A protein has these predicted regions:
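Sec-dependent N-terminal signal peptides
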Residues: 2-13
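Short, His- and charge-rich active-site/binding loops that engage polyanionic ligands
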Residues: 16-75
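Domain-level detector of nuclease and nuclease-like folds
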Residues: 59-187
Length: 187
């Protein structure tokens, strides 16, 4: 797979910006987590099957891996969601890279985050407009570092643009049971 890689240096970390032609991600090797991902919903009605697909580790980038997700409450949270790119198997497989995966609380990933992802696809269908999304992974306050070295995000900010309307949502990295995705709109 071809990647365009731009190296960024900051005071506290080493990060890479990677554009794989489907989404763009800034990835922190220090946190072993993405810092942000940008994408445009491509296939809101795609039917490609995820069956048999698993996350893969890209070459030359220190990422999280399966060990970070064992025996805990964190899912491999797609930031550029697989369902928005299920045009075909090849496109879908690009979303299964660990550069596109964050340690996301299972209650968030399977709850209101998933419902907001469905809204993105529904909006692309209903309005017939491009739906552009930026997901920012938050590392604020006291952070948890797993024994494997990966840092657990404190939350996620999702910025959705449909035409000339932009809305921002901020989710803590915790269970969202008993809430609605609209509750997380950033006012």
């Amino acid at each position: 797979m071809k990647y365009i890689i731009i190296l960024l240096f900051s005071v506290s970390s080493f990060a890479q910006v990677i554009d794989n032609g489907l989404y763009t991600v800034e990835y922190s090797e220090e946190y072993q987590q993405p810092l942000w991902v940008e994408y445009t919903v491509k296939c809101p009605n795609g039917k490609a099957s995820r069956q048999g697909m698993d996350f893969w580790v890209p070459k030359d980038i220190k990422t999280s891996d399966n060990e970070d997700y064992r025996n805990n409450i964190y899912d491999k949270g797609h930031l550029a969601p697989a369902a928005a790119f299920s045009c075909d198997k090849e496109t879908l497989l690009k979303t299964f890279s660990y550069i596109n995966s964050a340690l996301q609380h299972e209650g968030l990933n399977r709850g209101q985050w998933s419902k907001l992802e469905s809204f993105e696809r529904d909006a692309a269908n209903f309005f017939g407009k491009e739906v552009k999304v930026r997901v920012e992974v938050l590392f604020e306050g006291e952070l948890t570092v797993l024994p494997t070295g990966a840092t657990v995000p404190s939350g996620f900010r999702k910025i959705i643009t449909i035409g000339d309307v932009t809305k921002s949502f901020v989710f803590p990295n915790s269970d969202t049971k008993g809430t609605k995705w609209i509750d997380y709109i950033n006012k």
